[in-house]
Amino acid sequence: GQVVVFVEIGTDVCLSGINLNECVNSAVQKAYIENYYRKSVVKNSLFCRDNTNTNTPAILYTDFIEGSSVNIKLMVKGAGSENYSAVKMFNPSSSKSDIFEFIKQSLITAGEKSCPPYVLGIGAGGTMDYAALLSKKAFFNNTNTVEEKNFISEMKAYLSDFSSDILDIKLCSSSTHIACLPVALTINCHCTRHAKCSITQAGIVYERANNSFINLDDDSSLAQKCVFADDITAIRALNKGENILLSGEIYTARDAAHKRIVDDFAANGTLPFDMKDKIVFYAGPCPAALNEVIGPVGPTTSSRMDKFCEFMYSHGIVATIGKGERSKAAIDAISACGGKYL
């Protein structure tokens, strides 16, 4: 994911001889390269979508606080949840129910595509861009006012139909123009990856996560059928809802790779590989660490590949693997070709 960093600088602190932006980006680059994390940042959103291969530049916000410490708050945002975040400019006379309904409809749009259960960050106030910033800061806010706590409680009640899909709701509110009521929603997936530390003359104090996990007994309802990737008959015979353990050779490709495949075929009439009876995993693998065959691989939001389904399945793909629901057009294309979606 893309790294978002909030740096709070104490008024008694003097940062001399350093470029804070360069420091942050150097640290992000070092962390992503040395830990073999997946690098997800492209050079320019419109004109050069080549990977920087360093996961930089990070997004940096600075603020000033009282005291002699430097506080660093960091979050890592994946596109699966960020793509379904939203901002709406309400009329000042809008009710709480209007705001709650906006959040509800945004969650309906996100569906399963953003990896529920979710943590929601709500930002209210300022301008359009500031409300969005507040919705990010909300994830670090543990000092809500009584009014904010009541607002969150009422929102949770309004969203009761989503209770199993929401881990928590966080809120930051601020002043705004007399004629404005901007509200922003940032959706975080169940990982909601974030960290904090405070740097003082005495050293660095990290906020530690609670790592006391509960052991769960094996659930027999999750019994898996073993299927091999080259057993096309077994794959085509799979039924909706079956849990399988898939073994064998598969391909990984996300939207950028799909676009290249389609564009190359349109230009040259050839495919980069024989797609017949192949399986494509909608994922971007991380670099392999020493002694690893392949790095960690995480599924991406399948709906981004929906527009390629007809092409891919009609050219021989037998199954795709990803997360989240598919559009009706994608389902129809998969069914028409006798394919599967895992």
Task: Please describe what each predicted stretch is.
Residues G10, A79, A124-T127, C172-S174, ...:
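Short, ordered loop/turn segments at secondary-structure junctions
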Residues G1-C14, S114-A131, S173-C191, N243-I244, ...:
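Conserved phosphate/anionic-ligand binding catalytic regions in large, soluble enzymes, centered on
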Residues T143-S163, T252-L342:
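Feature captures the catalytic cores and cofactor-binding loops of soluble hydro-lyases/lyases
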Residues N142-S220:
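Domain-length cofactor-binding catalytic modules of enzymes
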Residues S220-D230:
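Short, structured beta-strand/loop micro-motifs enriched in basic residues and often containing a Trp
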